[in-house]
């Protein structure tokens, strides 16, 4: 003990220890893996995802969630004989509609930072955002190439609608990036701007199925109305449906992401709309709660549900095919 006491009491002892310990520590640290994942590492998915989902590909994963050829009822209504008279075209249209629709969902979930899709982990949480986005673009490119070679008469319809879908999505992303400074000020102009965005982003997807089947635009107005109803339904269930909140793992995901939706636009225009603005600019829990009280108020909720009912009047037969009917059962806490 005396030796160690004498050794530690010498002025040079700590210098000697530093000379020994620092290189050894540095050498050991150099061989350790990162304790926390880096931002770049988070872009990469989990190894061997097939062990988690039994599927290796993000597109196959989301297709398993939604099923295949879920646009078939629309195609059959537009052309009851297409399946038997031109089976190759029939199958190609269903593949195109699956591909465009589901790949948009894959990228949307990345943009929104969604945790779940229909109660299942969002694809990018398994495969990583980079691979998920690339697979989506890869699948769409495959469909474009195949359409151009096998069904060149369908290619112009597909390209035009895809451009409109992405134009609408771009508008939505710019509004989210720049906030209300990029959005109209007057109430009527706000609603019109939002409807135009939905006409592009959602409307073009629905118009696409009609144009591919009939190779004309004769059903554009009808399918645009179906699309507007679908957009309203999706927007409303985001803030009014408890079933949807459970499936997504969050309520008011649009608001939390700073993304405009029809209930948010309507809420901006009511007397207490000033409480919504801070939630879009500074998304603190307090601001979100204040905004939700307005968005889930009877006034805003009734305006939104009335618009849904109004848009549904002329398209009941199409909505029966669409078959989505979430309960809008959530209201503001008084």
UniProtKB/Swiss-Prot annotation:
Substrate binds at residues 101, 117, 201-202, 231, 238, 248. This is Prenyl transferase atmC. It comes from Aspergillus flavus. CDD domains: Trans_IPPS. InterPro entries: Isoprenoid_synthase_dom_sf, Polyprenyl_synt. Mg(2+) 1 binds at residues 108, 112. Keywords: Magnesium, Metal-binding, Transferase. Mg(2+) 2 binds at residues 108, 112.
